[in-house]
Amino acid sequence: MHAFAVDGLPEIDAGDDLAALVAERADLTDGDVVCVASTVVSKAEGRTAALAEFTPGPRAEEIAARLADVTGEQKDPRFAQAVIEEATEVIMDAPFLLTETTCGHVGVNAGIDRSNTGGAELLLLPKRPAESAARIQAGLAADVGVVVTDTSGRPFRHGQRGVALGWAGLPAARDWRGETDRDGHELAVTVEAVVDELAATANLVSGEGDDGTPVVVVREFEFGDHDGSEQLFRAVDGDFVRQALRGWTFDGA
């Protein structure tokens, strides 16, 4: 397996055909997985916004005041309102906003970006990244998989890594349960988050900052003769970390 960046992509504007732009610059073959950064998907889909578009309600005012108390920095309640509107749940409101987005992804600030925004104040995540991935896949001639990626922090460890927000043309996970390890023992719990691993691979190749490349092709990845699964995001009743966070309050300030 190897991965390479798709070079020469222009700055993406609303209405741009990402599939066509990729196809013009990459000689894709059947079985490739095309990993596309959510930032360019959002730009192509016109998911930019100005803070003035968000009128803060009482909850946003409360969150902004609380964050200002905790961090010692002034917080814009309009940004808090944008996060509330883009989230399905605010899991934590201090010392930062941890949210669930409409696609099921849990991250900070509903994934709203204030860098690489193409001149806008805010760049919102794609509304339905799985549908975004399917549209890109449909526009490519080769039989490929597509993963819409983002960078995200993680609990218990420093640093960010690439994760999948939406995907098409391949299962989300590879299920090893029922197979055996090298000692002949049956595997009982191993379900491998394939699309996240592909997203992390792409993130290593694409890089960050002004040298970043938003599209990476992973070639000769083989899913193998395994069961697949579309389950990537935990249901709340089995997500014990989220349940614990719901009952937790930050008491640092």
From Swiss-Prot:
Query: Which annotated residues bind a divalent metal cation 2?
Result: 151, 208
| Note describing how the cofactor binds | Binds 2 divalent metal cations per subunit. The ions could be magnesium and/or manganese. Monovalent cation. The ion could be potassium.
Keywords noted in UniProt: GTP-binding, Ligase, Magnesium, Manganese, Metal-binding, Nucleotide-binding, Potassium
**Which residues are listed for a divalent metal cation 1 binding in this entry?**
113, 150
Might you give the EC number(s) for this enzyme? Answer: 6.3.2.31, 6.3.2.34
User: What does the record give as cofactor?
Assistant: Mg(2+); Mn(2+); K(+)
Q: Could you state one GO biological process linked to this protein? A: F420-0 metabolic process
Q: What InterPro entries is this protein classified in?
A: F420-0_g-glutamyl_ligase (IPR008225), F420-0_gamma-glut_ligase-dom (IPR002847), F420_ligase_CofE_arc (IPR023659)
Q: Does the keyword Metal-binding apply?
A: yes
Where exactly are the transmembrane stretches of this chain? none
Pathway recorded for this protein: Cofactor biosynthesis; coenzyme F420 biosynthesis
Q: Does the keyword Nucleotide-binding apply?
A: yes
Alphabetized GO MF terms: coenzyme F420-0:L-glutamate ligase activity; coenzyme F420-1:gamma-L-glutamate ligase activity; GTP binding; metal ion binding
Binding, GTP: 9-12, 38-39, 43, 116, 206-213
Q: Which reaction does it catalyse?
A: oxidized coenzyme F420-0 + GTP + L-glutamate = oxidized coenzyme F420-1 + GDP + phosphate + H(+); oxidized coenzyme F420-1 + GTP + L-glutamate = oxidized coenzyme F420-2 + GDP + phosphate + H(+)
The record's listing under SUPFAM superfamilies reads: CofE-like
| Family indicated by similarity | Belongs to the CofE family.
Relate the assembly described in the record.
Answer: Homodimer.
Function recorded in the entry: Catalyzes the GTP-dependent successive addition of two or more gamma-linked L-glutamates to the L-lactyl phosphodiester of 7,8-didemethyl-8-hydroxy-5-deazariboflavin (F420-0) to form coenzyme F420-0-glutamyl-glutamate (F420-2) or polyglutamated F420 derivatives.
Q: What is this protein called?
A: Coenzyme F420:L-glutamate ligase
